[in-house]
């Protein structure tokens, strides 16, 4: 087996572990490595390629996640037999996929896989900590709703959502300053479905959606899946670059702006009131709508709230998305779109075309959960925990990160953005970090073109304060090994 690595930095270069994985995959698909063949030991292949053994381990992990190889402790890693259906021979027909499907596959394969990361501190994911879920309280509410609602709850409901949850959601948004009633709310399966519906509302195949760079990676996938292109708007310390925004929105092929002004993902910052007002003025001048993603808006644990764009908008420019996936638990899969005017009817038509009804029992239970004050009690506890976790990460960053690094100080949400010294590609750093016992999200996955980045996102969603300190210390050791003893800790905040 021959593997050739591109080691020179460049925008087109894949991370080293992915180069290894893709070349092994090619050997298997070409049947130069047969089913049952044993791959080289991790240590041996790392030595022959002159890479760290954790880089090879990450490559093998990616292949295992794809079902191409399987590892057995004490025996090694082996090529798996082609997958069969009901004992039949391997499929002779492989369908030709659409360009969109191929591109989505490429995007998914470019993302790190953490399936066998063992005891590493999970600072890569924004999935909430299950130990903080108010599961018992929600179960009591759900049981009560099912008992009182009976069989009708299990029928198809309206496309817009459960009537009581629509009223409750409108009241919840009004508390945040967004003037809306139940007629302007459409419930959806989390913010992800809301993003897809909002993109389809404004853009067709070949059109362009403007979005910050870096940005939420799933909006890039959603745009790709709809045959859309994206136009990056650079993020500055105080928010997106307004000059670039105006030039971009003035282009006729650009149909809308997607933005995360509150607890930005991945950066964690919150755009100021003045910056928001300027953004809305630009959108109004250019006649382009704004899709505001407020998925973490309920998670403020410090500082003074800033009005949502939808609260400042008086002309109907803004479509506002919200979700309970991060603030409550993701399994409920309930989000909401707030809109005005003809956009509401159009969104309902788009939703009905692919999704006849929602899970009425869960929506009814969530409405009761909010009305009973259970959600507010949960948020009060969650905010205290998140503040303590954020502070633990900030203290550890100041202690362990090298000179030249800087990071954000979020006032809510789950994420901190770290900018490392020049010359570091965090895609390659990840393999060393996994070996040292910490996971993070490399900045490249939030760039529109996936290019290399010296930045990374650290999450304090899943791990407790002690684990987070341990994870940052591990990251510091990895960076010290990369940069040499000359690196010294320095607290610099963005």
Describe the residue ranges of each PLM region.
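Short beta-strand "wing" residues that participate in macromolecule-binding interfaces
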Residues: 70-71, 180, 440-441
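N-terminal basic, amphipathic alpha-helical segments
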Residues: 1-144, 348, 352-359, 367-370, ...
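Conserved core of the PLP fold type I
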Residues: 142-287, 298-315, 386, 466, ...
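Conserved core segment of the aminotransferase class I/II
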Residues: 314-384
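AMP-binding (ANL) adenylation modules
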Residues: 446-450
